[in-house]
């Protein structure tokens, strides 16, 4: 996979990104599974990996860091995302009673240092805020992010699940560019195409980063009316391209410039997503799928 710029401010990333947002460390042999998945991604040309402090019950970063320290691959050959902001109750977080958001300076600085330690690295390529915390001072948050970038601990700044206005609001306080906004976007959730999020991302010369590109498996196995309707259309169009429905679903995202954020541990699904980059849906096929999603068939 040829690397591309995430925004006009950089950095270069693989066109597909692997994220650990669906991982659970309760599964057996988590480290062996992660090593297998990471090696598969690298083999397929995916060198960009998305983390958060909370993923895998606050343990995924550390497991990935073990892979870095074991020299399974070179740190300079991969691009690392991580994020903070969402806080969840867990035995390792005794002060957290309820799910809440925290983008205070104190929490951001502590989270970055913890992530660097767990990931066994001295810099994060892209650090993201997970949602906007209405109780934190935006000026303080922006100054903290700029300080982290100036220190070299963080190379770029991004956000996750920000509305258009939230994106604009934080950007107005920042003196460094926001290079990405992770948004949920797939054939079963096209809201970002209709509410201005995708348009604003493009206006800022960024690429939409689509999390849950297969809708958490619903595209292939969902039993609700929308999933069945979209899957029927995917099967029809897949025959034309001699491809599977998952590849077509991701090709639909790629067509308007979105980068799929993969979360599955199913190796064949990862390969299907990568295969989507060999397809080029024609305009009318794209709109047929869009209409099927909205129930306008």
Predicted regions and their residues:
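Acidic (Asp/Glu)-rich catalytic clusters
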Residues: 7-10, 67-75, 116-120, 149, ...
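Alpha-helix N-cap and loop-to-helix initiation/capping positions
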Residues: 29-33, 59, 63, 96-107, ...
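Short, well-ordered coil/turn segments that N-cap beta-strands
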Residues: 11-16, 45-47, 74-78, 121-125, ...
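Short, acidic/polar
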Residues: 28-41, 103-119, 167-168
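Active-site groove signature of glycoside hydrolases
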Residues: 116-133
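N-terminal binding-site loop/beta-alpha segment at the start of enzyme catalytic domains
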Residues: 1-78, 122
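Beta/alpha (TIM)-barrel catalytic core signal, keyed to glycine-rich beta->alpha loops juxtaposed to Asp/Glu
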Residues: 3, 132-297
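N-terminal small/glycine-rich loop or linker at the start of catalytic domains
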Residues: 8-26, 81-99, 128
């Amino acid at each position: 996979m040829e690397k591309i710029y995430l925004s006009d401010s950089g950095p270069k990333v693989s066109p597909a990104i692997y994220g650990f947002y669906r991982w659970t460390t309760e599964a057996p042999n988590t480290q062996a599974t992660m090593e297998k998945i990471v090696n598969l991604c690298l083999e397929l040309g995916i060198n960009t990996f998305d983390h958060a402090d909370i993923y895998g019950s606050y343990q995924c970063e550390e497991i990935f860091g073990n892979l870095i320290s074991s020299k399974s691959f070179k740190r300079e050959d991969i691009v690392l995302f991580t994020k903070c902001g969402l806080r969840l109750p867990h035995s390792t977080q005794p002060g957290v009673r309820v799910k809440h958001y925290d983008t205070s300076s104190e929490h951001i600085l502590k989270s970055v240092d913890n992530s660097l330690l767990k990931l066994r690295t001295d810099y994060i390529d892209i650090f993201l805020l997970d949602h906007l915390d209405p109780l934190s001072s935006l000026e303080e948050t922006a100054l903290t992010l700029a300080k982290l970038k100036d220190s070299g601990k963080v190379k770029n700044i991004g956000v996750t699940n920000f509305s258009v206005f939230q994106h604009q609001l934080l950007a107005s306080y920042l003196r460094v560019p926001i290079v990405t906004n992770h948004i949920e976007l797939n054939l079963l959730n096209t809201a970002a195409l209709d509410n201005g999020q995708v348009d604003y991302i493009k206006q800022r010369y960024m690429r939409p980063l689509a999390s849950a590109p297969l809708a958490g498996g619903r595209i292939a196995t969902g039993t609700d009316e929308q999933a069945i309707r979209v899957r029927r259309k995917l099967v029809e169009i897949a025959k034309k391209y001699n491809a599977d429905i998952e590849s077509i679903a991701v090709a639909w995202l790629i067509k308007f410039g979105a980068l799929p954020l993969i979360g599955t541990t199913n190796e064949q699904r990862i390969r299907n997503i990568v295969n989507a980059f060999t397809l080029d849906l024609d305009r009318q096929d794209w709109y047929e799928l869009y209409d099927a999603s909205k129930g306008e068939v």
